[in-house]
Amino acid sequence: KEPFMVINADDYYGKEAFQKLYHYMTTQMDASKPVFDICMAGFILSNTLSENGGVTRGICEVDSQNHLQRVIETYDIQKRDGMISARNEEKQKITLQPDQHVSMNMWGLPPQFLDVLESGFVEFLDNLDEKDAEKKEYLLPKIIDKLLAEKRTEVTLLETPDKWFGVTYKEDKPLVVEAIRGLIETGVY
């Protein structure tokens, strides 16, 4: 069993994010620690927004050593009138800073973490209510946030300046196609 990376299939994360996670996983990740040794790409919020509507991001709180303290799922994040506004889990309107770190679901995980995912997924399915089952998600940031609260993991945030892009809205597609074309033309991708 080897460390593994989890990403969203419909996102472009950038080259540096992959390099940083790979380097951490192959040179620093320590499976002998008494807690799960996890790493994640910490994107800059302003580099992860859609021009076509609100997005959901995990807002990251970190300590002075860039160890993740909490991931707070935040919804309907949009730039309006030069400000970035969003809704928290209680549906209250909040203002965010453009340079805040966010999770884009790019995680480096030790092999034994699969056991946590499996047992948690069984519990998630057992507790699903049929009336809203189609809208419920088994969110990795919430799982990791729970482990952080229980002091069962240490997560190192690896900051990346890469610009994320993905198709959150159908109107995003032409922008993504053009961005990927540009990456191909310049030899990045």
Where does each model-flagged region fall?
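Glycine-rich phosphate-binding loop signature in dinucleotide/nucleotide-binding domains
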Residues: 1-2, 32
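Short aromatic/hydrophobic "clamp" motif used to bind/position activated sugar donors
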Residues: 4-6
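The conserved acidic donor/metal-binding loop of glycosyltransferases
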Residues: 9-12
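Conserved core of the sugar-phosphate nucleotidyltransferase
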Residues: 14-107
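Conserved alpha/beta core of the MobA/IspD/sugar-nucleotide pyrophosphorylase nucleotidyltransferase superfamily
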Residues: 62-64, 71-74, 78-189
